[in-house]
């Protein structure tokens, strides 16, 4: 499979699948059809689209078999430095808590339950976006351009998914997109530095958990902090000499 075809297959497959679910939900809503089962199935089918087509393209373009993808997804046995790097960026991303941000009250076990939930509904996305799509882009594009391109595709995918799960109407679009842009740089930098899919999955899940349990009191300070996180991520990649070793 050629590079251009791999990109086309991934994007067309991913968006055809999730748009089809959106259209189904549009007609269900139009005719006032309510079904919890269809809602759950729609969330599952739409939610796995990026991962499913990532697996397909990984197999045909990178020749990575399904068993290897699953092994990489749960590859927790990696250098402690990789975990420290992940925690460093997460702490940096949520450092607004030191400047007036608040933590919502919750039961002690809730973050653990949410973490495992977000591995399935969140972390699994990393198979498509960081493990397959952006590495293909990086064969021809610099890190910054490929990350921005991935962000736009990932953002559109999220907006479609939020239409399916019903949260689009209450979404604070600008803060969400700014956060997603920051996450795009964090996760792509982590994958380039660690070459470990699990680190991206774990980081994605932790970010989702903390996003649900924290509130920023000063949005402008939060934006400045996120810009700083993006710059740090870019700096990390600029000093990674073997950035494209996997793809050569």
Sequence positions of predicted segments:
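Membrane-interface capping segments at transmembrane-helix boundaries
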Residues: 60-65, 237-248
